[in-house]
Amino acid sequence: MKKNLLGFTLASLLFTTGSAVAAEYKIDKEGQHAFVNFRIQHLGYSWLYGTFKDFDGTFTFDEKNPSADKVNVTINTNSVDTNHAERDKHLRSAEFLNVAKFPQATFTSTSVKKEGDELDITGNLTLNGVTKPVTLEAKLMGQGDDPWGGKRAGFEAEGKIKLKDFNITTDLGPASQEVELIISVEGVQQK
């Protein structure tokens, strides 16, 4: 009986300690504390900025063991917004995002490595029906208690993708072959 009680107590402590270290966060999109933005050069003369307004996701964060961190994000590609209705309609077409056939893009991390003050988050990005590995450079912006009794953590991440890697072959000129991703998220720790 004592052995069983001791085993149960040790197992409880082990699982409690593990879950306290690696916390799961839900991206706070309702509070407008998360953004999935992008930019691409327009003819080499200026930047064109856009955002995806509808997305959801979670991340697991363990500051002491980044290799245990995980990121999962789903983006509704129909929500693309560049502040120009005709351009947005074109981006939703089969020439670009093909939202009728591929209504979602997803990112699922496969590894997280600490590089100085940053985290290199490598994962599989599925966009336009194609899945390719992508690495995002992320920085912890801050973490701690919020005024409502919860805990939060915020990150900013950047990365680049080549359009042709995702079967987007419309010729936009040599200056417009890559899209830069700028992602800012604040997560609310789940209980």
Curated annotation (Swiss-Prot):
This is Protein YceI. HAMAP family: UPF0312 (MF_00780). Keywords: Periplasm, Signal. The gene is yceI. It is found in: Periplasm. The keyword Lipid biosynthesis does not apply. Residues 1-22 form the signal peptide. The keyword Signal applies. It comes from Salmonella typhimurium (strain LT2 / SGSC1412 / ATCC 700720). It comes from the Bacteria. Belongs to the UPF0312 family. Type 1 subfamily. InterPro entries: Lipid/polyisoprenoid-bd_YceI, TTHA0802/YceI-like_sf, UPF0312/YceI. One of its GO terms (cellular component) is extracellular space. Its main location: periplasm.
